[in-house]
A protein has these predicted regions:
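C-terminal subdomain of the subtilisin-like protease fold in secreted/lumenal serine endopeptidases
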Residues: 173-177, 292-409
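Secretory targeting signatures
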Residues: 1-27
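Active-site-proximal beta-strand/loop segments in catalytic clefts of secreted hydrolases
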Residues: 48-52, 145, 149-150, 157-162, ...
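Subtilisin-like peptidase catalytic core
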Residues: 51, 115-190, 235, 301, ...
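Gly/Ser-rich catalytic serine loop of serine hydrolases
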Residues: 131-140, 213, 271-284
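Loop/turn elements at helix/coil->beta-strand transitions in domains of secreted/extracellular proteins
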Residues: 42-46, 150-155, 171-176, 200-206, ...
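Extracellular S/T/G-rich loop segment that most often corresponds to the catalytic His/Ser-adjacent loop
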Residues: 105, 220-296
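Active-site core segment of subtilase-fold serine proteases
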Residues: 28-32, 36-140, 144, 153, ...
């Protein structure tokens, strides 16, 4: 897409939600640390900002912990050695005195046995800092969607909506993903100042959820600002085939509406859940996988925006805008024949096929899922450049972007 000055266009990664003890076990001598860093290779850091997370779930378990050099560089102040036996409730209670009750706002906490680092985005958000609330679970599912798209993403989880700024300021974060906002995308201020800082000043990407109603996304503080990637919902694999569900109108792209995601109050449980809240972090995961692969190809073993680029080495300089534009070109329009007019399904009961005439009026640039990852990688490394979309699509999306720029300027 042809943008005006890209002052307001460096993407971030965010979430959209509805409207310890110091580790003495992770020790390396200096020689081990050097070897570990050399072996670690490329990585990405995704920052979901949401209700909380369940680090006990098997979905987040890793065979190796994050290395000490990484924790030091990230600014980790505390490591929680999580209990590995018992029910979810028993594990939480067993760890209260050594972990949960010790966490303060000033802490950056690593949960051993995972690649999850957490912090409080705002004080007093919940009774147990960072841990997902017993009556919620949104943040755990959101993070699960990131990991489904990129199992090797490092997670920096921020509990509470004010955590966007903390994620934006952290130099090692690549993508912020947010899945919260008022129902109906009513035009009120929200996190736009913090996401703009993350994208335009820090060079990150931000993915923001459009509303779950049919309201336009333009005025939505989470997904509407021009520097944010606004994401609506699309049923990728349902009983009725590929279906557009009711969710924010005029998004940047659409992604999978219904997913099977981890429970917030169990060790192994999963549930089907729907909404742009989960389409959004899935997109963040896809983008993080692309960034990680490009860093691997170019020998970039750092993270965050550096010198204006998310991939930065002697042979490469790829910005958040470059990645966003490539995503726009690689996204695809489903064929109307893939729709099966059966019984309505899912949380939204007005699912319809994607129009064969002007699909971009429903999907924006199109669907983003893991199948297009290699196309984006090969476009950005120059091995197989992508072309622009058809003139009608480019013109329509330019008009939507102009409206967003006008509204948020």
């Amino acid at each position: 897409m042809r943008f005006v000055s890209f002052q307001k266009f460096i993407p971030i990664v965010v979430f959209v939600m509805f409207s310890g003890c110091i580790d003495d076990g992770l020790k390396f001598n200096s020689e081990d640390e050097v070897v570990k860093k050399e072996e670690w290779g490329a990585f990405t850091v995704v920052a979901p900002v949401d209700t909380g997370i369940n680090p006990y779930h098997e979905h987040f378990k890793k065979n190796e912990s994050l290395p000490m050099w990484f924790l030091d560089e990230f600014g980790v102040t505390m490591t929680c050695e999580l209990t590995q036996t018992g029910t979810w409730e028993e594990r939480v209670e067993a760890d209260r005195e050594t972990c949960w009750n010790l966490i303060t706002y000033n802490d950056t906490v690593y949960f051993s046995g995972t690649w999850i680092i957490g912090a409080m985005g705002e004080e007093g958000w919940s009774e147990t800092p960072i841990l997902d609330d017993p009556d919620d679970g949104h943040g755990t599912a959101v993070t699960g969607a990131v990991i489904d798209a990129n199992p090797d993403a490092v997670i920096f989880f921020l509990e509470g909506f004010d955590g966007v700024r903390r994620a934006a300021e952290h130099p090692m974060v690549d993508i912020i993903t947010t899945s919260f906002g008022p129902i109906g995308s009513i035009p009120v201020s929200g996190i736009e100042d913090d996401t703009e800082y993350a994208v335009n000043e820090m060079g990150k990407l931000h993915t923001g959820a459009c509303d779950n109603t049919g309201s336009t996304c333009v005025q939505d503080a989470t997904g509407g600002p021009p520097w944010s990637i606004g994401i609506a919902g699309f049923q990728e694999d349902g009983d009725r085939g590929k279906v557009m569900h009711c969710s924010g109108t005029a998004p940047d792209i659409v992604a999978d509406w219904t997913q099977n995601l981890p429970d917030h109050d169990s060790i192994e449980g999963y549930h089907d859940t729907s909404g742009t809240s989960f389409a959004t972090p899935r997109t963040a995961g896809v983008l993080s996988l692309i960034i990680q692969e490009l860093r691997e190809q170019y020998g970039d073993e750092s993270s965050g925006g550096r010198n204006g680029s998310l991939i930065y080495s002697e042979n490469a300089s790829i910005t958040n805008y470059d990645i966003r534009r490539s995503m726009e070109k690689a996204s695809y329009f489903p064929d109307a024949t893939e729709y099966d007019p059966g019984a309505n399904e899912g949380a939204c009961q007005t699912g319809v096929p994607v129009s064969p005439v002007a699909p971009y009026t429903q999907t924006g640039w199109g669907v983003v899922d893991p199948t297009i990852s290699m196309m984006i990688i090969e476009d950005l490394n120059g091995s197989s450049p992508l072309t622009d979309k058809d003139f009608d699509c480019e013109t329509y999306m330019d008009s939507i972007m102009a409206a967003r720029i006008a509204y948020w300027s």
